């Protein structure tokens, strides 16, 4: 039984939830207050004079004179060392280059030896993609040779279709291949026997080449449902959301009215008016439901 006659329970529940969300947003907007930003602490005036006096103190003349001289002396001392180090590095580099050249000459490789090895690589290793390219064609040919059995599918209006099958194919394979989308509506009959088990193979049914299968396509699919699915449907019917809607709204309104009475200072006039309107609307809905 629907909560409102002519309107589904899902629509009523959806509008109820949307209305509740709007009321909560309105209540939050009416009670929301913006706190003033805190004033930043200004720097203490006593600290600035000390910094200014420290920065304005002159450096002693001895330090100013000694620092450039010390820097020049260190530069003069470091220049011979750096020149000697650069000369040693150049000599080591020339010896290393000569050693590398000698090794390349002893090995019989030129400067482009790496390029010769890369160009010679494909010739020594033949491509491996050729066997894989020929393999699918061989499998297709094998599958075509295996499906050498022909079945005649005869309908009630005396029309026939031929099916290329394999003796190891199942009844379900024939339904999926030749009756796509109508698997649960097709009934296959062989020698007056209804073939209900889709896992049976053609060889187990003793179907020979050029055998006739009578096909019947029903308008309504009669699909067998397991016992667990039927039990789940019964539980779903027992736990109808419509029967829990009224107690849920009563509980929510009770909580809102409790907070409105205990914490009256947090509820503004628009929030209280919205709560009163929701209560009146829900009372009319509940009265209409229980009157029937």
Curated annotation (Swiss-Prot):
Cellular compartments annotated: Membrane; Cytoplasm; Nucleus
CDD domains: Ubl_TMUB1
Membrane topology of the entry: Multi-pass membrane protein
Domain Ubiquitin-like: 149-222
GO terms of biological process kind: ERAD pathway
Basic and acidic residues: compositionally biased ranges: 71-80
Major site of localization recorded for this protein: membrane
InterPro entries from the UniProt entry: TMUB1/2, Ubiquitin-like_dom, Ubiquitin-like_domsf
TM region(s), chain numbering: 11-31, 237-257, 269-289
Region listing for Disordered, in residue ranges: 34-143
UniProt key word Membrane: yes
One Pfam family per UniProt: ubiquitin
Low complexity bias (residue ranges): 84-94
Keywords assigned by UniProt, alphabetized: Cytoplasm, Membrane, Nucleus, Transmembrane, Transmembrane helix
Disulfide bonding pattern of the chain: none
A GO cellular-component term linked to this record: nucleus
Cross-referenced Gene3D superfamilies: Phosphatidylinositol 3-kinase Catalytic Subunit, Chain A, domain 1
Function: May contribute to the regulation of translation during cell-cycle progression. May contribute to the regulation of cell proliferation. The membrane form is involved in sterol-regulated ubiquitination and degradation of HMG-CoA reductase HMGCR. May be involved in centrosome assembly.
Official protein name in the record: Transmembrane and ubiquitin-like domain-containing protein 1
Organism: Danio rerio (Zebrafish)
Gene name tied to this protein: tmub1
């Amino acid at each position: 039984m629907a909560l409102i006659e002519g309107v589904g329970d899902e629509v009523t529940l959806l509008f109820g939830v949307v209305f509740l969300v709007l009321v909560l947003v309105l209540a939050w907007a009416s009670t929301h207050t913006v706190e003033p930003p805190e004033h930043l602490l200004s720097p203490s005036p006593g600290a600035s004079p000390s910094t200014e006096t420290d920065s304005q103190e002159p450096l002693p003349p001895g330090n100013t004179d000694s620092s450039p001289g010390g820097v020049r002396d260190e530069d003069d001392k470091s220049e011979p060392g750096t020149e000697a180090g650069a000369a040693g590095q150049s000599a080591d580099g020339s010896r290393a280059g000569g050693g590398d050249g000698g090794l390349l000459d002893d090995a019989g490789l030129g400067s482009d030896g790496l390029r010769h090895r890369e160009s010679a690589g494909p010739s020594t290793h033949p491509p491996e993609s050729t066997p894989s390219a020929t393999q699918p064609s061989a499998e297709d040919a094998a599958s075509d040779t295996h499906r050498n059995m022909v079945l005649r599918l005869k309908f009630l209006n005396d029309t026939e279709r031929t099916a290329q099958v394999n003796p190891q194919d199942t009844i379900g394979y024939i339904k999926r291949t030749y009756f796509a989308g109508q698997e649960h509506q097709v009934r296959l009959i062989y020698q007056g026997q209804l073939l209900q088990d889709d896992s049976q193979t053609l060889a187990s049914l003793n179907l020979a080449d050029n055998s006739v299968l009578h096909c019947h396509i029903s308008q309504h699919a009669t699909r067998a449902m397991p016992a667990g699915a039927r039990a789940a449907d019964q539980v779903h019917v027992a736990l109808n959301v419509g029967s829990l809607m009224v107690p849920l709204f009563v509980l929510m309104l009770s909580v809102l009215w409790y907070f409105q009475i205990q914490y009256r200072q947090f509820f503004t006039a628009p929030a209280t008016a919205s709560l009163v309107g929701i209560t009146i609307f829900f009372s009319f809905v509940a009265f209409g439901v229980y009157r029937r």
